[in-house]
């Protein structure tokens, strides 16, 4: 049902941002995914159920957060739910209106650019090639980094298994006491190395954001001479393009982080299986160690083969975004359903503004002298 999609959104939020505070992006993701899942099914018969589900999922974001509840968090939770519910209703009402506005905007743009259709198509084609040149090295770098990090992880973990096998052969009488420290150290190393792996791979997606901004700005400059009296409409379309491209970059970052977490979760049971076998006989333990060694290699290799191509896949998606823009601005565009990206961008802007306003109010609440006396909470 609708709830299922929202639960998946919350699961992604948990993987990509385990923070002590709820943030604007998390809330916007839940509202947008909920709106998208509803689609055209927002019938009056289930309106009250849908609202209660949305309220439930937003409240879930505030559960199990670290630290005590602050005045800001408490105020946020009280104000957020009615704000989000109203925003969701507005999304439903504004969708068709915005769809018509975007259709008219593209119609005006195409009419203005039609005399220069060949030049415009050429400029976008040039921009595609520039984008490929910009992003190509990053895709290669990601693949290289994935290979390197996977090899390092394998090299760092294998010695622990080998040491446990050696200890097992030498201490058959006291297996549990002898192997426990090694198993615990292996567990700690798995957690540490996977975090380091994420730390090295996820910045790749952040670098792509900068390249996207540069490329869209160059495209704006190259098309400006052909859209002098419709520049605002062209800018709006390019803002939508940049939003979609950056969204792909954020999704790439989330996928890398999620796959690293999957790797961790895949390795943990293997280490635990050794712990569980310690109370049995040496033969059981030997089998567990053999499986640990084999499965460790397999898990790391699966990660390498899955994540390695992410860069190339991302680059193809970026080229597709530019090709879609070329089609939209071309004389044979036909009907293009792209108003939803603008609707999502507007939603995220509104949620971000809501959070910023609330935080500004909170920051202005304490008396000014209290800022000088940092150890004293309430200006005492």
From Swiss-Prot:
Subunit notes for this chain? Answer: Homodimer.
sequence repeat placement: 33-54, 60-81, 82-103, 115-136, 137-158, 159-180, 181-202, 203-224, 225-246, 247-268, 269-286, 287-308, 309-330
The terms describing its cellular component in GO are: chylomicron; extracellular vesicle; high-density lipoprotein particle; low-density lipoprotein particle; very-low-density lipoprotein particle
Any single Pfam family the record assigns to this protein: Apolipoprotein
Q: What is this protein called?
A: Apolipoprotein A-IV
Looking up PANTHER family in the UniProt record yields: APOLIPOPROTEIN, APOLIPOPROTEIN A-IV
Q: Which GO terms describe its molecular function?
A: cholesterol transfer activity; phosphatidylcholine-sterol O-acyltransferase activator activity; phospholipid binding
Q: Where is this region: Disordered?
A: 361-380
User: Know anything about its domains from the record?
Assistant: Nine of the thirteen 22-amino acid tandem repeats (each 22-mer is actually a tandem array of two, A and B, related 11-mers) occurring in this sequence are predicted to be highly alpha-helical, and many of these helices are amphipathic. They may therefore serve as lipid-binding domains with lecithin:cholesterol acyltransferase (LCAT) activating abilities.
Subcellular localization(s) per the UniProt record: Secreted
Q: Which residue spans traverse the membrane? A: none
Tissue specificity statement from the Swiss-Prot or TrEMBL entry? Secreted in plasma.
Q: Which InterPro entries match?
A: ApoA_E, Apolipoprotein_A1/A4/E
The region annotated as signal peptide is 1-20
SUPFAM superfamilies annotated for this entry? Apolipoprotein A-I
Q: Name one GO biological process term.
A: phospholipid efflux
Q: Which family does it belong to?
A: Belongs to the apolipoprotein A1/A4/E family.
Q: Which Gene3D superfamilies match?
A: Apolipoprotein (1.20.120.20)
Q: What the protein does?
A: May have a role in chylomicrons and VLDL secretion and catabolism. Required for efficient activation of lipoprotein lipase by ApoC-II; potent activator of LCAT. Apoa-IV is a major component of HDL and chylomicrons.
Q: Which organism is it from?
A: Bos taurus (Bovine)
């Amino acid at each position: 049902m609708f709830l299922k999609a929202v639960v998946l959104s919350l699961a992604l939020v948990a993987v990509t941002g385990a923070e002590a505070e709820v943030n604007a992006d998390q809330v916007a993701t839940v509202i947008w995914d909920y709106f998208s899942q509803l689609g055209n099914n927002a019938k009056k018969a289930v309106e009250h159920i849908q609202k209660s589900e949305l309220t439930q999922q937003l409240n879930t974001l505030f559960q199990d957060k670290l630290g005590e509840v602050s005045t800001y968090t408490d105020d946020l939770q009280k104000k957020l739910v009615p704000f989000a519910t109203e925003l969701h209703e507005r999304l439903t009402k504004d969708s068709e209106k915005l769809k018509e506005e975007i259709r008219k905007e593209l119609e005006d743009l195409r009419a203005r650019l039609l005399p220069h259709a060949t030049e415009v198509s050429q400029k976008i084609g040039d921009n595609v090639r520039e984008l490929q040149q910009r992003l190509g090295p990053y895709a290669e770098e990601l693949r290289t980094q994935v290979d390197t990090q996977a090899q390092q992880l394998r090299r760092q973990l294998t010695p622990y298994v080998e040491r446990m096998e050696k200890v097992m052969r030498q201490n058959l009488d006291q297996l549990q006491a002898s192997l426990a420290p090694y198993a615990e150290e292996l567990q700690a190393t798995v957690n540490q190395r996977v975090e380091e792996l994420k730390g090295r791979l996820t910045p790749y997606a952040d670098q792509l954001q900068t390249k996207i901004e540069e490329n869209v700005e160059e495209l704006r400059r190259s098309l400006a001479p052909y859209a002098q009296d419709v520049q605002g409409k062209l800018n709006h379309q390019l803002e939508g393009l940049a939003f979609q491209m950056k969204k792909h970059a954020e999704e790439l970052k989330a996928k890398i982080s999620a796959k690293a977490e999957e790797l961790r979760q895949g390795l943990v049971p293997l280490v635990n299986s050794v712990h569980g076998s310690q109370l049995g006989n040496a033969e059981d333990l030997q089998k567990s160690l053999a499986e640990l060694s084999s499965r460790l290699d397999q898990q790391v290799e699966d990660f390498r083969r899955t994540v390695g191509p992410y860069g190339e896949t991302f680059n193809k998606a970026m080229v597709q975004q530019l090709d879609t823009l070329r089609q939209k601005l071309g004389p044979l565009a036909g009907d293009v359903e792209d108003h939803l990206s603008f609707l999502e961008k507007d939603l995220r802007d509104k949620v971000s503004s809501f959070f910023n306003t609330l935080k500004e109010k909170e920051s202005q609440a304490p008396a000014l002298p209290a800022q000088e006396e940092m150890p004293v909470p309430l200006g005492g």
